[in-house]
Amino acid sequence: MVKKSKGRQKIEMVKMKNESNLQVTFSKRRSGLFKKASELCTLCGAEVAIVVFSPGRKVFSFGHPNVDSVIDRFINNNPLPPHQHNNMQLRETRRNSIVQDLNNHLTQVLSQLETEKKKYDELKKIREKTKALGNWWEDPVEELALSQLEGFKGNLENLKKVVTVEASRFFQANVPNFYVGSSSNNAAFGIDDGSHINPDMDLFSQRRMMDINAFNYNQNQIHPNHALPPFGNNAYGINEGFVPEYNVNFRPEYNPNQNQIQNQNQVQIQIQNQSFKRENISEYEHHHGYPPQSRSDYY
């Protein structure tokens, strides 16, 4: 197999003729040189001073503990007094600890950066695979133009309609119809009698609404829990018919005149009974109620 590129080759150590390449190489090599000097100071505790002039006559320097102290010691070559030497050692120890912490932090940050780069490459590969499969809804919208965004919106609306239809079919197949009569519960899922779909309705709120309506109790509906009394007049001459059910929770308030009212009612009932007896009308006979009773003397 023929190689398409020359690969990594040894660079010839001559001055570069291209100015742009020269500036780029100087910047990269200078950073690498200062990094190596910092590692040498950290690992070995050495004192280093580096002064570099760029091709544009700019000065760059690096020194540990600092450039001035290292240069002064190199020029004068005089040993420091004992007390100054001790102070210098304390300062150097403190600086070394700070530099060590910074180097450790830099190492951690660089390792995290490499990890994030690997994750980015993996996600990029996954995105390319999904894009090839046709998962257009996972494309980043930040990279789309206005016309592409309008088309993306239309595709999402069509997808919403399809999902609404499938969800309504699923609910109709799995949820029984609790509504009485000819009405259909398709409207609860966004579909009316004409099979028109309303994709703007929330399926989850519709499901909750359906569950509530399906088991809704109508308090106005009459449930005859016991047999009704017969039509006609009772022993007191009162016409009987449908009566409301007894309410267990009903508690009448106390009325101090209740006994007096009951006595008056009893007196009225006695007067009515006496009037019936004077007219020779049976207290169990019904004349004006429904249904009429058959009598032989009518014929």
Curated annotation (Swiss-Prot):
Residues 6-66 form the MADS-box domain. Residues 99-133 form a coiled coil. GO terms for cellular component: nucleus. Gene3D superfamilies: 6.10.140.920, Transcription factor, MADS-box. Its main location: nucleus. It holds the Pfam family SRF-TF. The keyword Coiled coil applies. Keywords: Coiled coil, DNA-binding, Nucleus, Transcription, Transcription regulation. InterPro entries: MEF2-like_N, TF_MADSbox, TF_MADSbox_sf. It comes from the Eukaryota. Disulfide bonds: none annotated. It is found in: Nucleus. Interacts with AGL36, PHE1/AGL37, PHE2/AGL38, AGL80, AGL86, AGL90, AGL92 and AGL97. Plants lacking AGL62 show a premature endosperm cellularization and a seed-lethal phenotype. Probable transcription factor. Required for suppression of cellularization and promotion of nuclear proliferation during early endosperm development. The FERTILIZATION-INDEPENDENT SEED (FIS) polycomb complex is required for suppression of ALG62 expression at the end of the syncytial phase of endosperm development. This is Agamous-like MADS-box protein AGL62.
